[in-house]
A protein has these predicted regions:
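Aromatic side chains
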Residues: 13, 38-39, 103
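Negatively charged, low-complexity tracts enriched in Asp/Glu with abundant Ser/Thr
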Residues: 1-28
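Surface-exposed polar/charged interaction patches
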Residues: 11-12, 31, 90, 94
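Short charge-dense sequence patches
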Residues: 1-3, 29-39, 76
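Compositionally biased, intrinsically disordered low-complexity regions
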Residues: 11, 45-46, 106
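Short, compact, well-ordered microdomains
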Residues: 64-107
């Protein structure tokens, strides 16, 4: 059964190692164990903007309920860190600022 609690961006940023993000989304929603998949999320913390979490953390009900919107998917932590850098760079190049939340709302 697909859990609708997890919120996903319509067009998430994808790391180079991601081939079929919709399949990954389905597996994450089902609670499958995907040890190499990392997710970039908006942060719930007021002093942070983006966070990187391993997808397997969403197998726990509490984490599924409290997970902020997922805006990126990567294969491996290093790729996830590069993806965050790419997001910040894109926002800055297109706006001249780093208002990442506002930019992602309009994307």
């Amino acid at each position: 059964m697909v859990n609708r609690v997890i919120r996903w961006a319509r067009n998430p940023y994808l790391g180079e190692g991601i081939e079929d993000w919709k399949e990954i989304r389905t597996k994450v929603n089902k609670g499958d164990f995907l040890p190499t998949i990392f997710l970039v999320t908006l942060s719930n913390h007021p002093d942070h903007v983006l966070e990187i979490i391993p997808s397997f953390m969403l197998r726990q009900r509490w984490n599924r309920k409290t997970c902020p919107k997922i805006v990126g998917i990567a294969k491996g932590k290093k790729e996830a860190m590069n993806l965050v850098a790419d997001i910040v760079r894109e926002v800055y190049e297109n706006t001249g600022a780093v208002e990442i939340r506002e930019y992602l709302k309009k994307r």
